Amino acid sequence: RRQRQMCIRDSPWINFQKKNEFNPVHVHGGDLSSVIMIDVPEEIAKESDTVKDKTNMPCPGQLEFIEGPSGYMYTGSYKVVPKTGDIFVFPAQLKHTVYPFTSDVTRITMSYNIFNIQVDSNTQE
């Protein structure tokens, strides 16, 4: 019989995001992706809060998930101002981006991809 197992096939990686750095819109391989917010300085949330009523401003320090398959017009998005301790798990093919911030701080995150694999098993229940 075949069993499904979830595994982290690639090594997790640590991101050190500094002032003015960003991750462009992208997707990952695998079935699920995850990001753990290890250290998100409060300055990033304060910076994001100062522009929330200005619709023509970017989203400093925010993580955005963009719905819709790659190559098509997207149907919507979800933006979040992450904080230390947040964990996000999402479909690996979900487009997402991380916006830059201008505060002189470093945000530390850990990311990894999860693969759903099938394995043969001789065990019987």
Question: Where on the chain are the PLM-derived regions?
Answer:
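Catalytic core of non-heme Fe(II) oxygenases with the double-stranded beta-helix
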Residues: 10-89, 97-99, 105-109, 116, ...
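Short, small-residue-biased leader/transition segments that mark boundaries at the very start
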Residues: 3-8
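Short secondary-structure boundary segments
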Residues: 1-2, 111-113
